[in-house]
Amino acid sequence: MAFNFNWSPLMADAGFYTRAQELLTAALNKSPKPPIIVGDITVTELNLGSIPPELEILEIGDLADDRFRGIFKMSYSGDAYLTLKTCVQANSLNTYMVTRPKFTSPCPLAADHGLTIPLQITLSDIKLSGFVVLVFSKQKGITLVFRNDPLESLKVSSTFDSIPFVRDYLQRTIEGQLRLLFMDELPAIIHRLSLRLWVPELRGQDTEVKADEEAGPGQDPLLSPPQDPVDASGNVLSVAQIASLSLDSGVEMHSLFSQRNLVRLATLTDSQRTLSLFTPTIHDVVFRALTGAMEQSESHGGLISPASPPLSRTHSHVASLHSLQESSMSKSSLGSPLSGCGLTMGAGRHPRTRPSRKHKRRVVDLRKPQKLDDTSSTCTDSEYTVSTDASTVFSSSARVGEKPDDPITPPVSPDATIKVKDRSRVPAMQGLGPSVTNKAGQSTPSAEAEKITLSNGEPSYIPHQNTPTIEAHEKGDDNTISLNGVPPSMLSFVAVSQDRSILEQAWMMKLANEISRRIQEGKGPGSVGSNYCGRRDPSPPPAYGQ
């Protein structure tokens, strides 16, 4: 069985070539393009040539007036050609960087910048050979499917034919793209073309598309002026002004809005954020459609707690400040700022605060009970004696004038004076408080140092500001020394014993008389003795401005 192909009508129909170029352009840009092609591929020329393909019938499955199905062997070696235009990337390093992941590719500074060059490619000398399944129907068009890869060879001519490696690269790349085109895209292109030729409904759609293209784009509704146009300042424009604007340029017509619309937009702007055009105007009133969480946080200063209201946190903060002020005035209220801070920080979690505990001070008296009687005296011109109760010195119930187990006996030295270094000892003893007591009979390093000073007989002096007065007073058989306000540095060597010798008692009397005489000499306004004896309740200073 032989077939005669009438190939000349395809050469004469210009509309067929136009539709074929559009379909080929869409097909070439649809498939994934190689990275070297950076622009769209456009089919500029398409010519099927004058030599038709050769068909050999292998099988006919269905044959009727309106349908046909058969398997053919097709071979084509004609003069058809195809011309494409696109843009390619001339810098191969740029292509390499695009196709590689960033963490494995180098980071050149300027060597990978792109260089785009226009490219024109012409495909000619196309040779095809393969098995084709052809199905024809007037209602469904023509379906052409290749059972194998039909492309044998083709010639690629481009702008870079003078560069061998570019020419070879384009040859390989285009051959691969054409193989995909013949296997996937060409059957769909042929089917769409056949539908436009034989199906009348699709012919009507093509006619409507052509009519729309001839009509041109629609008119912009904004170019037609409104009924009451105004300018940007709100001034009403006349017909002559509108005509002059339209003659100058059509762009400024977009800025002409209706005065009524401008009034409604201004009302919407002043509508108290309620999106209502008719919100009543009330002074000192802010309208809100909904109170959000952000506005609640702004009204309460940003203190939001799901467990407690913001007002409780505010009051607790004030309480903590008040407690901090009280703590600077009294040491006993030391726990109040801590409790106030805890109330402030954890008001939502711990509604109750723990009361501050008072520190218990336990005093253990390990000394032996004394048999001395407390005596008292007052300040006189020659001498003064006070009770031996040491509570004025140590602020406790511990006794000072007691019998030591190992009494300290200084040597007899009538010319020696006592050098007292109580500047470093008094703060230490005052800081320890009543919780620290020395055992009876123990000698401290300071006492031994003072004993060595007395035994050497070195002359010393007693400063008026830091040296208290000591006086020995004999009553009956026992010799006692009355102390009042004596610093702890003097207590280390003023221990009284009943077994002292007469010489030692005489030395103590002379020492007491010397101290009393110096006190009497230094007595006066601003002196140490007068301040020590009479400064019990000092009068407050006069007020400012008097």
Curated annotation (Swiss-Prot):
Disulfide bonds: none
CDD domains: SMP_Mdm34
Membrane topology term: Multi-pass membrane protein
Alphabetical keyword list: Lipid transport, Lipid-binding, Membrane, Mitochondrion, Mitochondrion outer membrane, Transmembrane, Transmembrane beta strand, Transport
Region: Disordered, residue numbers: 208-230, 299-319, 344-382, 395-416, 517-546
Composition bias type Basic residues, residue spans: 349-362
Function as written in the Swiss-Prot or TrEMBL entry: Component of the ERMES/MDM complex, which serves as a molecular tether to connect the endoplasmic reticulum (ER) and mitochondria. Components of this complex are involved in the control of mitochondrial shape and protein biogenesis, and function in nonvesicular lipid trafficking between the ER and mitochondria. MDM34 is required for the interaction of the ER-resident membrane protein MMM1 and the outer mitochondrial membrane-resident beta-barrel protein MDM10.
Subunit record text: Component of the ER-mitochondria encounter structure (ERMES) or MDM complex, composed of MMM1, MDM10, MDM12 and MDM34.
Domains: entry comment: Lacks alpha-helical transmembrane segments, suggesting that it resides in the membrane via beta-sheet conformations similar to those predicted for other outer membrane proteins and porin.
HAMAP family: Mdm34
Name used for this protein in its record: Mitochondrial distribution and morphology protein 34
Species this protein is from: Arthroderma otae (strain ATCC MYA-4605 / CBS 113480)
Lineage: Eukaryota, Fungi, Dikarya, Ascomycota, Pezizomycotina
